[in-house]
Amino acid sequence: FDFGIFFSGSALRSILINGLDPFLEGNRIPNKNVLKFIADNHWSVDNPNPNAEYPRLGLTTGDIGNNTVNSTYWLRNGSFLRLKNLEIGYKIPYGRIYVSGANLLRFSPFDLWDPELSSWNSYPLQRTVNVGLQLNF
């Protein structure tokens, strides 16, 4: 029987999320297609919640000018711990049987996207599982 495990992670790390659509365009283009979690949790005249998770959306460039200003408001805890690789094997008389996996688990308080990626529109890391048989001749 054999076993291998590898964790990777990052601590004391912040993620600046002000490049998030629909705020990416700043003063140039008003908000058009809005991510659902922003549309559901933004400040508006109809919902003047001072603790709204996201700032005002707008249809004119004057409405959204301050949304991309760098601020600690946009900082989020980007710490994470990932089970990067796991392999379990069993030796048989003429070889070995094994199961291995990559990117199986992630623990993080940041839930908008994978904190190991550079931004919200990066391709996600693939989760893979392999089952194998090694034979010795």
Residue ranges and their predicted role:
Residues 1, 83-88, 127-131:
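Hydrophobic, lipid-facing positions within transmembrane beta-strands of outer-membrane proteins
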Residues 41-51, 68, 106-137:
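C-terminal beta-signal and terminal closure region of outer-membrane beta-barrel proteins
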Residues 95-105, 125:
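Short, surface-exposed polybasic-and-hydrophobic patches located at secondary-structure transitions
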Residues 89-93, 100, 134-136:
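Structural signature of outer-membrane beta-barrel channels/translocons
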Residues 1, 10, 92-95, 126:
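Outer-membrane beta-barrel channels and translocator barrels
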Residues 1-5, 95-99, 131:
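Transmembrane beta-strands of outer-membrane beta-barrel proteins
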Residues 12-95:
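Extracytoplasmic gating/loop element in the C-terminal half of outer-membrane beta-barrel translocons
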Residues 7-13, 85, 101-108, 137:
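Transmembrane beta-strands of outer-membrane beta-barrel pores
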